[in-house]
Regions:
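Non-catalytic nucleic-acid-binding/docking modules located in mid-to-C-terminal regions
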Residues: 3, 9, 13-20, 201-350
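Aromatic side chains
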Residues: 33-35, 80, 106, 175, ...
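Noncatalytic, basic helical substrate-engagement surface that gates or grips nucleic-acid strands
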Residues: 2-14, 18-164, 191
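Nuclease catalytic cores that cleave nucleic-acid phosphodiester bonds
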Residues: 45-46, 125-275
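Solvent-exposed, flexible loop/coil residues
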Residues: 13, 23, 43, 91, ...
Length: 350
């Protein structure tokens, strides 16, 4: 879910052309959940093959990522979640309960023919299984798209990659990567049209956004440490926050007092959890530093075999996606040869 900072975060609306030639560290689980939530039949049922294996996420990966790569030259590196942090277990249990309730409501609405309600409940019931995740990794490998396995939270790993200059921005809908220190965050990169909000039962138009961490900190007159404290007051995936304290109130507290400890006890009777552990989760997260970011060649036969023979995709549509990626490889190869012959240096993708 991520920390709800929208009311106080300065965002810049961008277009996909603004990401031309950039390398993005993609929060894989976040993106796959969105594909699973939105790529569905009118009654809310996910796309599946004849054996009942879900393919919605593979559809999203194949067609939306290849479009970004072919039309805009954007390089994508997918970062997958590892073992959930201990502090996140309570939040994950809440999510399981919400999904279970939504699943029951979806089945009831679908049985009654109320497809509008069924779709909304189906979105909230989305679950990314281990098999789905492994299928996604397999497809990405066949496409030559790199994956990095984070030891814990993918957004922390992606933030490190951007901070080190190996990627230009983190791609995720959540703001957590800012708390982890990502210099830049882009939202809604892989989605088009409208986003459905299950909690409100409505949808909103998707506008791609760029958030610059330093601009956010300067605009709020906060340090990154104070921004983390602000988030802890509001509530994160690691803690519940303080009842009645939203982003604007938390910002007021941080500007006035500077830290949670400095807030008077008559204003804040008790802190929102173990502050040392919570701060460490964001300021010193578990990451791997010896990752490899390598963009490989596409295994065309492997892509066709996996998607068409095993998962029963339309050969025509798969062929279209494959041709798009082949055109990207051809253009890059031609550019590299020209650069080599002319002594020019290519622009860094990050």
């Amino acid at each position: 879910m991520g920390v709800p900072l929208t009311p106080i975060i300065k965002r810049k609306v961008i277009s996909l052309s603004d990401l031309r030639g950039r390398t993005l560290a993609v929060d894989a689980n976040n993106v796959l959940y969105q594909f699973l939530a939105l790529i569905r039949k009118p009654d809310g049922s996910p796309l599946t093959d004849s054996e009942g294996r879900v393919t919605s996420h593979l559809v999203g990966l194949l067609f939306r990522t290849t479009r970004l790569m072919s039309e805009y030259g954007t390089r994508l590196a997918f970062v997958f979640d590892g073992k959930p942090p201990r502090l996140k277990r309570a939040e994950l249990e809440k999510r399981r309960e919400v999904r279970a309730k939504a699943l029951a409501q979806w089945k009831e609405a679908k049985a009654s023919g109320d497809y509008a309600t069924a779709f909304s409940k189906a979105v909230a019931s989305s679950k990314l299984s281990l098999q789905m995740s492994e299928d996604a990794k397999r497809l990405l490998s066949l496409l030559g798209v790199p994956q990095i396995q984070a030891p814990s939270d993918a957004e922390a790993q992606a933030a490190l990659m951007v901070a080190r200059g190996d990627a230009w921005a983190v791609a995720s809908q959540d703001y957590d990567s800012l708390l982890y220190g990502a210099p830049r965050l882009v939202r809604y990169v892989t989605l088009t049209g409208r986003e459905f909000l299950p909690s409100k039962g409505e949808s909103k138009r998707l506008l791609r956004e760029l958030i610059d961490l330093q601009s956010v900190l300067d605009g709020l007159n906060l340090s990154r440490e104070s921004l983390v404290d602000l988030a802890l007051l509001v509530g994160t995936d690691f803690n519940d926050g303080v009842l009645g304290v939203g982003p604007k109130t938390a910002l007021k507290f941080m500007r006035q007092y500077g830290s949670i400890e400095a807030i008077p006890s008559n204003v804040l009777p008790r802190p929102p959890g173990d502050l040392d552990s919570l701060r460490k989760a964001f300021l010193d997260p578990e990451v791997v530093r010896d990752y490899r970011l390598e963009f490989g060649d596409m295994d065309e036969e492997g892509v066709v075999s996996f998607l068409c023979k095993e998962r029963e995709f339309s050969p025509q549509r798969v062929d279209e996606a494959v041709k798009r990626l082949k055109s990207v490889r051809a253009r890059r190869s031609a550019l590299t040869k020209w650069m080599d012959s002319s002594g020019q240096k290519p622009r860094p993708f990050r």
